[in-house]
Amino acid sequence: MDIVHIIVLSLVQGITEFLPISSSAHLVLVPKLLGWPDQGLAFDVAVHIGTLTAIVFYFKDSIFGLLRDFFVSIVRRERVGDSTLVWAVCFATIPAGIFGLAFNSLIEEYTRSGIVIAVTTIIFGVVLYLADKRVGTKSEYDVTIKLALIIGLAQALALIPGVSRSGITMSAALFLGFSRVGSANFSFLMSIPIILLAGGLESVKLIRHDISYVWSDLALAALISAVSAYICVKLFMSIISKMSMTPFVVYRLILGVFLLFIFV
């Protein structure tokens, strides 16, 4: 890949991965506007590694304690500390895992068009706006297994390009009475196993197809996506602690209309 392609697409992935604005919409739009070829499977794996590193580093002060409580709860077969939060993340991952394995081929075949991405970007932007009006006070530590499964079902919708995984999970959490910060934190925690699964599947495909790649290019892509994703998460959390999701809703609507203009 050209160095400019690597920098731009890595920044796009890092900036949009955790914001409720649909990374897939941007990764379709940028190459389309610039006339660039598909970035390839190896690049996808690299930026997934980068964004995963970013979110793990963001939760560095709590993630090891959460994992400790989780594994101790397994050994003792009882709730320990904040183990329920980790169990909730695990259960929230199940719906997307099941639907992904069952319908991934169909989704790839029928929903990867620019028009579909444009329409879903607009529709679920409106959903985010409506959900933001229902904002509550629950934090991520108030999540139950039942609530996690509901949010997990919403996450399964993000298999459709343009929906936005972070956008739909935050929307579901807001509808269920979570605060903006609480919904974002739980959404980000949910992203860890999802990115691991997606990156793992892509890695398997990469190995099976014996695709050639340049290690320095992949390292650069991972680094740029990691740094940009971490900065965006920090800024996003600062923004929603002080104001509503409206700026992101407006951006989605503008983006969706722009995509319709390009692809219709």
From Swiss-Prot:
The chain crosses the membrane at residues 1-21, 39-59, 83-103, 113-133, 143-163, 181-201, 220-240, 244-264. Its main location: membrane. Belongs to the UppP family. GO terms for biological process: cell wall organization; peptidoglycan biosynthetic process; regulation of cell shape; response to antibiotic. Bacitracin is thought to be involved in the inhibition of peptidoglycan synthesis by sequestering undecaprenyl diphosphate, thereby reducing the pool of lipid carrier available. It is an enzyme of class 3 (hydrolase). The keyword Plastid does not apply. It catalyses: di-trans,octa-cis-undecaprenyl diphosphate + H2O = di-trans,octa-cis-undecaprenyl phosphate + phosphate + H(+). One of its GO terms (cellular component) is plasma membrane. It is found in: Cell inner membrane. Its EC number is 3.6.1.27. Catalyzes the dephosphorylation of undecaprenyl diphosphate (UPP). Confers resistance to bacitracin. Pfam families: BacA. GO terms for molecular function: undecaprenyl-diphosphatase activity. This is Undecaprenyl-diphosphatase. It comes from the Bacteria. Keywords: Antibiotic resistance, Cell inner membrane, Cell membrane, Cell shape, Cell wall biogenesis/degradation, Hydrolase, Membrane, Peptidoglycan synthesis, Transmembrane, Transmembrane helix. It is a multi-pass membrane protein. InterPro entries: UppP. It comes from Campylobacter curvus (strain 525.92).
